[in-house]
Regions:
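Arg/Lys-rich, positively charged N-terminal/basic patches that mediate binding to nucleic acids
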Residues: 1-24
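Sequence/structural signature of beta-propeller domains
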Residues: 3, 28, 35, 48, ...
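Amphipathic alpha-helical interface surfaces
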Residues: 9, 25, 29, 48, ...
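Compact soluble domain cores
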Residues: 12, 21-41
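Residues that form generic nucleotide/phosphate-binding pockets
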Residues: 16, 32, 102-105
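Basic/aromatic recognition patch in beta-strand/loop cores that engages polyanionic ligands
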Residues: 39-83, 87
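Enriched for short, Lys/Arg-rich terminal
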Residues: 70-110
Length: 110
C-alpha cells in the first residue's frame, strides 16, 4: 500500500534550489524519494542526514547538484540543503556539526 510523503523545505533549501533546478527537476527528485526514501547515502556524524545526487539542466546526476535531506519519519522528508557539485564535493566536519544541531531541531518538529 502506498502512503503519502510530505516534503518540507528549509528556507535555505528553497533559496538554493531555485538557483539550481527547475520545478520539473525538483519534482523528479521528489518522485525518486517517494519511491526510494532511503536512497541517499547517510552522511556520518549528522544524526541521519542523507545526500543524494540530482540531475539539473543538461548535466547528469554525477556532475550536477547534491541535495541533503532528512527522512524524519516514514511520512516526512525535510529538504535541507542543495548545492552544485562543482562548489563542494563533501561537507566539512564543521558543517556536519552545524547540520547535526539542525537535524535535532527538525526531528523535534515532527
Amino acid at each position: 500500500m502506498c502512503h503519502a510523503i510530505e516534503f518540507i523545505e528549509t528556507p535555505l533549501f528553497t533559496r538554493q534550489i531555485k538557483q539550481l533546478a527547475t520545478d520539473d527537476e525538483l519534482l523528479t527528485l521528489q518522485r525518486e524519494l517517494i519511491a526510494f526514501p532511503d536512497k541517499g547515502d547517510v552522511i556520518q556524524n549528522t544524526c541521519g542526514l542523507r545526500k543524494i545526487r540530482m540531475a539539473t539542466g543538461t548535466q547528469g546526476k554525477s556532475g550536477s547538484a547534491r541535495v541533503i535531506y532528512l527522512l524524519a519519519t516514514r511520512e516526512i522528508i525535510w529538504l535541507v540543503l542543495a548545492y552544485p557539485k562543482s562548489a563542494k564535493e563533501n561537507l566539512t566536519e564543521a558543517e556536519k556539526a552545524q547540520l547535526k544541531k539542525l537535524t535535532a531541531l527538525l526531528i523535534n518538529e515532527v
